[in-house]
Each structure stands twice: as structure tokens, then as C-alpha cells.
UniProtKB/Swiss-Prot annotation:
Gene3D superfamilies: Hypothetical protein apc22750. Chain B. This is UPF0145 protein Patl_2194. It comes from the Bacteria. SUPFAM superfamilies: YbjQ-like. Pfam families: YbjQ_1. It comes from Pseudoalteromonas atlantica (strain T6c / ATCC BAA-1087). Belongs to the UPF0145 family.
Amino acid sequence: MIMTTTPSIEGKKIERYCGIVVGEAVMGANVFRDIFAAIRDVVGGRSGAYEDELTNARQIGFRELEAEARSMGANAVVGIDIDYEVVGKGGSMLMVSISGTAVSCSDL
């Protein structure tokens, strides 16, 4: 499946707009990881635990987006937008929301 942030795909013709698709993932933050991340931030290191959680959440979101697009008969998603939100009590959770337009396209 082709997935792109652009509104069109070079070399392809959009035959049908299937609809808006969304993939979301909400990940809880572990208290111990939060403590170690804060220590790393103080000493200037990168927080690998948070980076791993972001990557995992993004991958889940893209899988959901693709599954929804396929269920509509699409073979591509255009205009993809990725949003990140900190949610939950005290910002204890991370939400990744990915949206786009499912389309059916063919070669030019």
C-alpha cells in the first residue's frame, strides 16, 4: 500500500476517493521509565525509552490506518497527517493519531 503526506502520487491517477481513514494508538508511560528519562534529560542524553514508545505507537497507528484503507478497497492513502498528544492524568499517556484519505489509484 502506498502511503504519502502529499495530496497526489506521482505516476498514478486517483480513480476513486474511498474516504477518510484514521489510525490511533494510546500508550501508557511507565513510572520507572519516566524517572530514568528525566535523569537522561538533565545530563543531556536522549530518552531511548520514550523514542521506542513513540516508534511503537506510530507503527500501530500506521497498521490501523492501512487496515482501514484496505477494508474500503483502497490501495493508497494520501494527505497523511500525524499528530502527537500527551493525555491522561498528569500527562501519563501518549496518543498518536494518523489520518489521511484512502484512495484507489492506477498507473498513468
